[in-house]
């Protein structure tokens, strides 16, 4: 039906007769001439109808936005004064000789100027996806998956599918359960990841595996989360953690070079401890120049319990955050930032405004100055590198609260004061995470997942001091987003059972949930390691959007609903009866 795409016509096509198929993006009726912007997935081209082709001109008078049409015509160069530099096809236009209206469109539920609520965009997603910027994002996503497949194939990885209907295993989030009709009362789970299957593939001898795969997690959503999402899933045998990182870094550098024309260079490597200490986050945004600086040793003897208490507490921390040019902040802005850090558990926000450093105490403005000597202030300013016109904010509490509060404040200030370089790419690897973290109930939970191997510890050493264990794990972070994470896996049965025990999984439960894995570990399991990238998040970064729903064709809302199909929906009673399921209505409060 077509010979060319609208958006691909150029000066090289001048004089050629072409047939185009697409939609009316905009129509301008000048009486004797009618112009339309005609759109398809590749872009927009201007088509015009003149009186010499009377039949086509008459039919064109009926055109309205989003009519689906076919046009045959001749490509012509535009006059110099009519060239549109903002359009890829702006140097040419098509003189139509014939027009076919394939399908008409009713009045549109979406605003023609694209000023629409997200609810409307999701309800009429098939119309929203016609917008050039949305089409471009999905085209970029397709390009990314194609580049990934070629790269992985060239590096000896095998694309192997793993099951969608599997067994529920604890991986940190709730499972989506699927009832079995044949085995009444039993349920499959949709996979949160192919984690165990890809490890079993390594045990099967496949050596290098990858898969672009759907995963499912029934968890509370955020702007960058979806209940179903896509992973670039990778596993290798006989490769060390640095070797895995080298290959995966090469993949990401390849993507950025091909999609953005940007060479990311070598990725720096930073430990979890350093990232938390300097940036208050395990996924630091290195485009932001501000860093947290420890000053507890300078404040142990001050007559100010807010500082002295945490400074003398082994579990406490006092840190300073220098804000270049921050002395310009008003009292209201400072109060607003003080309220902001309370979200993260901080009790408030002490500060020092540096007006004229050379004047010592007389050159600063601070509500805590009366508790500080000139020497202490000078030492703080020296350590933080403060200059005239800067602001120093303080965090004083337990280590987690200080890291969370100042880390979040750092990001907010970086954005609010334009200190973060939005035109820069800042990738890094974060390694050496704690193996376990406090579950808040007196026990431990795996920071990554229970199949991650510890660094340089035997099973007996791990059992003796689990809180000291460092995981042989690694995350890739770009511009403050965790885009991928992985680890070296446990390939020893004793170690795996030890980890399960530390996590409070008794032997009976181990056999019930992971018996197949424990059995497989008995038969010559190779050392193996892997990683998974979030394809949605990678695409989000590569297309420059901050909303993950913009890079998924048919996403869910933050309430995990599809407004277009109205899923989830109630099942009919016959289907429920066949499955042996009874829906229990929630009791109403009297």
Curated annotation (Swiss-Prot):
Which intervals of the chain are annotated as region Aspartate? 195-198
This protein's major location comes to: cytoplasm
Signal peptide bounds: none
Q: Cite the InterPro entries for this sequence.
A: Aa-tRNA-synt_II (IPR004364), aa-tRNA-synth_II (IPR006195), aa-tRNA-synth_II/BPL/LPL (IPR045864), Asp-tRNA-ligase_1 (IPR004524), Asp-tRNA-ligase_1_N (IPR047089), Asp/Asn-tRNA-synth_IIb (IPR002312), AspRS_core (IPR047090), GAD-like_sf (IPR004115)
- Cysteine pairs forming cystine bridges in this chain are none
Name of one Pfam family that matches: GAD
The record's EC number reads 6.1.1.12
**Any single Gene Ontology cellular-component annotation:** cytoplasm
| Gene Ontology terms, MF aspect | aspartate-tRNA ligase activity; ATP binding; nucleic acid binding
Keyword set for this entry? Aminoacyl-tRNA synthetase, ATP-binding, Cytoplasm, Ligase, Nucleotide-binding, Protein biosynthesis
GO BP, one example?
A: aspartyl-tRNA aminoacylation
The protein's annotated catalytic reaction(s) are: tRNA(Asp) + L-aspartate + ATP = L-aspartyl-tRNA(Asp) + AMP + diphosphate
The protein's matches in SUPFAM superfamilies, at most eight in alphabetical order, are given as: Class II aaRS and biotin synthetases (SSF55681), GAD domain-like (SSF55261), Nucleic acid-binding proteins (SSF50249)
Q: What class of enzyme is it?
A: ligase
**Residues annotated for ATP binding in this entry:** 217-219, 226, 482, 534-537
Report if keyword Transmembrane is assigned: no
Q: Keyword Protein biosynthesis: yes or no?
A: yes
Query: Where in the cell is the protein located?
Result: Cytoplasm
Q: Where does L-aspartate bind?
A: 171, 217, 448, 489
**Protein family membership:** Belongs to the class-II aminoacyl-tRNA synthetase family. Type 1 subfamily.
* Function comment: Catalyzes the attachment of L-aspartate to tRNA(Asp) in a two-step reaction: L-aspartate is first activated by ATP to form Asp-AMP and then transferred to the acceptor end of tRNA(Asp).
Complex and partners: Homodimer.
UniProt name for this protein: Aspartate--tRNA ligase
Q: What is the source species?
A: Salmonella agona (strain SL483)
């Amino acid at each position: 039906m077509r010979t060319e795409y609208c958006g691909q016509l150029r000066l090289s096509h001048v004089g050629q007769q072409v047939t185009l198929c697409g939609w009316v993006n905009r129509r301008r009726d000048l009486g004797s001439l009618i112009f339309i912007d005609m759109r398809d997935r590749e872009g927009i081209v201007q088509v015009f109808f003149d009186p010499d082709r009377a039949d086509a001109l008459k039919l064109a008078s009926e055109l309205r936005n989003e009519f689906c049409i076919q046009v045959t015509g001749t490509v012509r160069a535009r006059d110099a004064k009519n060239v549109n530099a903002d359009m890829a096809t702006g140097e040419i236009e098509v003189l139509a000789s014939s027009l076919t209206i394939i399908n008409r469109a009713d009045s549109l539920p979406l605003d023609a100027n694209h000023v629409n609520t997200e609810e409307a965009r999701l309800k009429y997603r098939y119309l929203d996806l016609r917008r050039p910027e949305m089409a471009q994002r999905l085209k970029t996503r397709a390009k990314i998956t194609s580049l990934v497949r070629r790269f992985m194939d060239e590096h000896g990885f095998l694309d192997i599918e793993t099951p969608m209907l599997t067994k529920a295993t604890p991986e940190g989030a709730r499972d989506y359960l699927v009832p079995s009709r044949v085995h009444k009362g039993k349920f499959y789970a949709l996979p949160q990841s192919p984690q165990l299957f890809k490890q079993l593939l390594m045990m099967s001898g496949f050596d290098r595996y990858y898969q672009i795969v759907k995963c499912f997690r029934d968890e509370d959503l955020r702007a960058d989360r979806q209940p179903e999402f896509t992973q670039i899933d990778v596993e290798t045998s006989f490769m060390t953690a640095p070797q895995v990182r080298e290959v995966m870094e090469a993949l990401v550098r390849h993507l950025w070079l091909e999609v953005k024309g940007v060479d990311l260079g070598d990725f720096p490597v930073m430990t979890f401890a350093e990232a938390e200490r300097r940036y208050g986050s395990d996924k630091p945004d290195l485009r932001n120049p501000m860093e947290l600086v420890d000053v507890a040793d300078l404040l142990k003897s001050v007559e100010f319990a807010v500082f002295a208490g945490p400074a003398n507490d082994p579990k406490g921390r006092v840190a300073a955050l220098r804000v270049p040019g921050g002395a310009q902040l008003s009292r209201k802005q400072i109060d607003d930032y003080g309220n902001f850090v309370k979200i993260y558990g901080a009790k408030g926000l002490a500060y020092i405004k540096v007006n004229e450093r050379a004047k010592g105490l007389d050159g600063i403005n601070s509500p805590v100055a009366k508790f500080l000597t000139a020497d202490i202030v000078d030492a703080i300013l020296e350590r933080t590198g403060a200059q005239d016109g800067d602001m120093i904010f303080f965090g004083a509490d337990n280590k987690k609260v200080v890291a969370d509060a100042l880390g979040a404040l750092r990001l907010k200030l970086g954005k609010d004061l334009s200190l973060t370089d939005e035109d820069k790419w800042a990738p890094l690897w974060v390694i050496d995470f704690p193996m376990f973290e406090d579950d808040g109930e007196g026990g431990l939970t795996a920071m990554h997942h229970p199949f991650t191997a510890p660094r340089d510890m035997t099973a007996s050493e791990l059992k003796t001091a689990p809180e000291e264990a460092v995981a042989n794990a690694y995350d890739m972070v770009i511009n403050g987003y965790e885009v991928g994470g992985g680890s070296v896996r446990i390939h020893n049965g004793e170690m795996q059972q030890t980890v399960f025990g530390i996590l409070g999984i008794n032997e009976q439960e181990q056999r019930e949930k992971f018996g197949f894995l424990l059995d497989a570990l008995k038969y010559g399991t190779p050392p193996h390691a892997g990683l998974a990238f979030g394809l949605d998040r990678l695409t989000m970064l590569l297309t420059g959007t901050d909303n993950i729903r913009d890079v998924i064709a048919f996403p869910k809302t933050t309430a995990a609903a599809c407004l277009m199909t109205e899923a989830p929906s109630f099942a009919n009673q016959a289907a429920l009866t066949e499955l042996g399921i009874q829906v229990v209505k929630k009791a109403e409060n009297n």
